[in-house]
Amino acid sequence: MHKSLIKSQSAIVDEKDNLIKAFGNVSVKSNDGKKLLTDSLLWDNSSDKIFTEATLEFITSDTDTFYGKGFESNIDLTNWNILNPRGSINNE
């Protein structure tokens, strides 16, 4: 079973729309080692999707790190898309 842990400096829970808005040093860590770092994040609890329009760093392994602006994924970071990517992959 895939799981993720979200941490931030602050968050707003919108129970009506079933959303969580996280702000300030947001990190999402999946149990398989992926890590998303950004300044703001929206979690749609209805669809278990996360989104950000902010700049981000996404670490998929010890050697692969992607950077970009704009990100969407399922909550466990197994199906993700960086909207404006740039990156570094080490083939060692």
Where are these regions (language model features)?
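Mature-chain termini and adjacent capping regions
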Residues: M1-E92
